[in-house]
UniProtKB/Swiss-Prot annotation:
Keywords: Keratin, Repeat. It comes from the Eukaryota. Residues 4-87 are annotated as: 14 X 2 AA repeats of CG. This is Small cysteine and glycine repeat-containing protein 4. One of its GO terms (cellular component) is intermediate filament. Belongs to the KRTAP type 28 family. In the hair cortex, hair keratin intermediate filaments are embedded in an interfilamentous matrix, consisting of hair keratin-associated proteins (KRTAP), which are essential for the formation of a rigid and resistant hair shaft through their extensive disulfide bond cross-linking with abundant cysteine residues of hair keratins. The matrix proteins include the high-sulfur and high-glycine-tyrosine keratins. Human have a similar number of genes as other primates despite the relative hairlessness of humans.
């Protein structure tokens, strides 16, 4: 039920306005194997479940600890986000980007 038929990869919480060309390369069986080629369109929510995985509409994530920013930009939580007080396991980025050393929630 994802934005580009990649529900297993998280998809998009909202709508994918720009249309996702190739979607997630690799089929998204158990997560995006090689990541997505590039970000697509405009997404309202993007989620990255593990390092190297990205949703069908979110730019590739690296070093994520549970979530991407809720804006279509390349910025993900770092593993040190647990000390930011933004929540652990569910991603520390709720509305803004997570910096390399601290969250900007």
């Amino acid at each position: 039920m994802g934005c580009c038929g990649c529900g297993s990869c998280g998809g998009c919480g909202g709508r994918c306005g720009g249309g996702c060309g190739g979607g997630c390369s690799g089929g998204c069986g158990g997560g995006c194997g090689g990541g997505c080629g590039g970000g697509c369109g405009s997404c309202t929510t993007c989620r990255c479940y593990r390092v190297g995985c990205c949703s069908s509409c979110c730019p590739c994530c690296r070093g994520c600890c549970g979530g991407c920013c809720s804006t279509p930009v390349i910025c993900c939580c770092r593993r040190t986000c647990g000390s930011c007080g933004c929540g652990y396991g569910k991603g520390c980025c709720q509305q803004k980007c997570c910096c390399q050393k601290q969250c900007c929630c």
